[in-house]
Amino acid sequence: IPWFQRRGIHNVTELAWWEESSLDTPDGPARVVALPARHWARRSLIADARRLWASWALILPSGNAIYFAGDSAYFPGFAEIGEHLGPFDASLLPIGAYEPRWFMQTAHMDPDEAVQAYADLGGRGTFVGMHWGTFRLSNEDPLEPPHRTRRAWAARNYPGEDLWILRHGETRTRRLTAPPPRNAGL
């Protein structure tokens, strides 16, 4: 929190995994839930893993919910998140920076694992592929992740219109419909 305060940002809430806070919206309070992820945190050359890394759920007053995986490897926690809060109307999942697997598998999922994570989260709604093609962080071709994700998606027979891999700078919107029956929560 001091980092934010030094920069003039004072309305900050720090959460541990499975803790939640609320965010005021014109339609009422939205729930913001900090959730597990599999990665590490480093904020300087010498301070390794002193801060918690997280994924997030945003549950709107309407009941619609969005999941943001952040930077994460695949791990069994996706199924637990899906059990408690899924399915989601949109899931933003990383699809890049995964080769070589022997080195990257503890920090970044590959496209097949991202589609598995989507299934674990409830397998419904829009899958938005992220964390690819901006910086060369690993050994795969920077344009490979979208192709591999589309193949993994098709192998599960998910609807093509639910897979969004945006071009750089692209914007899309999707009208949220009534939320699906959702698990009870925490």
Give, region by region, the residue ranges found by the protein language model:
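Core dinuclear metal-dependent hydrolase active-site scaffold
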Residues: 15-86, 151, 167-186
